[in-house]
Amino acid sequence: MESPRIGVVRDSMLHRPLLIKPTLGKSKSRGLSYPGPEFVFGTATTVQDGGVQEAISNWHTHTMSTTHRAAERDFIALNREGVKSGLVTAKELHQYRATHDIRRKPLTREGFRRSAPPRLSPDDSFFVSNRPSTPISELIEYKYAQRWLEEQQVRDRVLQAHQHKKAQLGRIQDTRTTLLRKSQPLPEAPSTWKLPRFQKVGAALDTFRDPEARKKAMNAHCSESVSRRGILGQGTYTVD
């Protein structure tokens, strides 16, 4: 049961969902109009059936027409000719394309022809060859294991010879004696100027037990300063 309508009710109002009022007990319509009973859904097929005679005498093939196709520009050829002319920048190539025009040849039916497959002899056969059978005598005699051991021994001998040759060609490590021979004495830095009253002032702190211990420590420091980093030889050791 529909609610009463006021005003003129037109057929066009049934196509607008905002104006459609649902019937009591039914779902609301979406405003879709269906064609009449004489309308047939689907596409009409044209049957060109001439029987067996047409099927035997005619063979419909697709003909490729290239007359309506415009030839495309060959940018590869344009770039190649531009580079040959000495143009390398994008602006120069753009100007070259604007003043020159090279077109690609339109595709024809001959361009799609593929080479015929090679003719095969009727005696040719296609198969996968099987692995040759393993002789049972070699399995019983354990020859495969012996062969594997021999291959491993040959590989180890080659590896040892390579390592021995590499060790002989390696760099000889420097020792402390070689470093002392190559070292150069550090230049003595000039002493800073001091006031006359401070020239004969001794050290305020002496951490050695006696002058002999101090002398030994200074000699050891001077002998090891060659292999240490830094200007004064007080850094880490340079011998890796």
UniProtKB/Swiss-Prot annotation:
The keyword Cytoplasm applies. GO terms for biological process: integrin-mediated signaling pathway; positive regulation of focal adhesion assembly. It is found in: Cytoplasm, Cytoskeleton, Cilium axoneme; Cytoplasm, Cytoskeleton, Flagellum axoneme. Transmembrane segments: none annotated. One of its GO terms (molecular function) is GTPase activator activity. Its main location: cytoplasm. Keywords: Cell projection, Cilium, Cytoplasm, Cytoskeleton, Flagellum. It comes from the Eukaryota. The keyword Cytoplasm applies. GO terms for cellular component: cytoplasm; cytoskeleton; dendrite; external side of plasma membrane; membrane raft; motile cilium. Belongs to the CFAP77 family. Microtubule inner protein (MIP) part of the dynein-decorated doublet microtubules (DMTs) in cilia axoneme, which is required for motile cilia beating. This is Cilia- and flagella-associated protein 77. The lineage of its organism: Eukaryota, Metazoa, Chordata, Craniata, Vertebrata. The gene is cfap77.
